[in-house]
């Protein structure tokens, strides 16, 4: 191992079993957990985010859970700052930071840093929001494809927040978001190569998922049904009762919450809500797999295996991450 302290990333698609394995690892390694999940940061959003129970969190604390109100935003840049601070505190106590979750953009921001994007411009943003209202998101997506085809290919046509931000960056700076990111990447080439990137840590990157994608889809459907049985609709109903929350907020646009919110707005039947919630979760898992396929030096684990703890320990020993 290099002179850098160790850190472990435990990544994977939703419903793959990341949290259970992470907790197992804390029982045999001197690790402390850091959540890497854009939904778990929000207080009061417990059922639909599959947040670990209060009992589990009391026994196995996770940093960066319940750190924001749903009315607040939380960016990848903010995550990077918070995660680096948490990792430094954990390392200073002689422990190993174990980062667990499936928000892949957060991992990438942590490793590579973030391109120095232009600040938000209220006037430009208002113009774009008015266009979205008058012309529809498809027109905004068409405009983005003209000036930044790579971002247009990456951003879903029905994702207003990211569409507007990408167009805002172009209109404010005269450069596409892709151009900004390429410059950032070029500047980072001198940094350490491999999974550690800019981080002052030697990183072991693990990913867990069922080898059979059909099994993952079954798990996703079962978990969404269980969420509904556990009171997910009432959870969203409580959020809707707040005058400061609306469907356009990042918190409410989280997978599952958006579909239940639309159901409570009368836009979907109960069956449609259930079906669309499951489909949206499957699409999230597909995007997570796409990120992971391009991740450097990742070691895969099969969710269906019964010995993932021993397999993980064997791998960590083989790469000397613990020495």
Curated annotation (Swiss-Prot):
The keyword Acyltransferase is assigned to this record: no
Keyword set, alphabetical order: ATP-binding, Magnesium, Nucleotide-binding, Transferase, tRNA processing
Keyword tRNA processing assigned: yes
Subunit structure: Monomer.
Protein role: Catalyzes the transfer of a dimethylallyl group onto the adenine at position 37 in tRNAs that read codons beginning with uridine, leading to the formation of N6-(dimethylallyl)adenosine (i(6)A).
NCBIfam families associated with the record: miaA
Protein name: tRNA dimethylallyltransferase
């Amino acid at each position: 191992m290099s002179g850098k302290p160790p850190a472990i990333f435990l990544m994977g698609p939703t419903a793959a079993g990341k949290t259970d394995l992470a907790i197992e690892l804390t029982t045999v390694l001197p690790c402390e957990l850091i959540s890497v999940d854009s939904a778990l940061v929000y207080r009061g959003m417990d059922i639909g985010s599959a947040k670990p129970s209060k009992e589990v969190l009391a026994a196995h604390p996770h940093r960066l859970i319940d750190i924001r109100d749903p009315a607040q935003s939380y960016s990848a840049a903010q995550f990077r700052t918070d995660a680096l601070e948490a990792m430094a505190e954990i390392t200073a106590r002689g422990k190993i930071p174990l980062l667990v979750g499936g928000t892949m953009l957060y991992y990438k921001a942590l490793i590579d840093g973030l391109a120095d994007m232009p600040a938000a411009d209220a006037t430009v943003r208002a113009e774009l929001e008015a266009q979205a209202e008058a012309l529809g998101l498809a027109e905004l997506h068409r405009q983005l494809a003209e000036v930044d085809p790579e971002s247009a290919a990456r951003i879903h046509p029905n994702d207003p927040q990211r569409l507007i931000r990408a167009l805002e960056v172009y209109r404010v700076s005269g450069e596409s978001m892709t151009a900004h990111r390429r410059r950032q990447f070029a500047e980072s080439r001198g940094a350490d190569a491999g999974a550690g990137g800019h981080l002052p840590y030697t990183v072991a990157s693990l990913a867990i998922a069922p080898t059979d994608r059909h099994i993952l889809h079954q798990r996703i459907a079962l978990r969404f049904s269980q969420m509904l049985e556990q009171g997910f609709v009432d959870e969203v109903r409580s959020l809707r009762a707040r005058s400061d929350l609306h469907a356009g907020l990042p918190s409410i646009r989280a997978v599952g919450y958006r579909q239940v919110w639309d159901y409570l707005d009368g836009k979907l039947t109960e069956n449609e809500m259930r079906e669309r919630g499951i489909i949206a979760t499957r699409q999230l898992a597909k995007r997570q797999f796409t990120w992971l396929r391009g991740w450097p030096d990742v070691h895969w684990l099969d969710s269906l295996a019964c010995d993932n703890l021993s397999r993980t320990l064997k791998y960590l020993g083989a790469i000397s991450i613990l020495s």
